[in-house]
Amino acid sequence: MIDAAAEEKISACLDTSGYGDTKALLKLAKKETVTNILFDIKSVDDDIHRAYTGVSNALILENLRALCSEARIREKITLRMPLIKDVNDGMELIERTAALYKAQKLKKVDLLPYHNLGIGKQRNIGGTQKEFEKPSEEHLTEIAEFFKNFAKMEVGIYGRA
């Protein structure tokens, strides 16, 4: 699809969890028509990541580092952090996350407070999904300020309502 967009001179956004083949991800990220890369990081802590996603974050972090190793790719990246109260919003974990982002010279992060919009759909198809809470407004602001001040990042907070 990205190649078809390129033929029509349409820019594309690469939206990734980072969990995939490094060479394929780099190949897509290098394309001139890919002007934005949305890279989701659920947790930099491998134990937390495994507990809530079922897989290690090692490949995801490796792919993030690979993308960040090239300045022209790194400039396209906006990190997205889904935040769940008492799961991945503790300040120690936020500090570790910000340190990683700063070390990779990343400039933008979007904080995505948890929402339960998918729970009804899961129930309708016979599935179950654990219910979580989103962090408080005050805590979201504290996290955003930490990223701004420590990592010197541009921060967006989406889905507050």
Labelled PLM ranges:
Residues 1-112, 117:
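Conserved AdoMet/S-adenosylmethionine-binding subsite of the radical SAM
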Residues 85-161:
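Auxiliary Fe-S-binding modules of radical SAM enzymes
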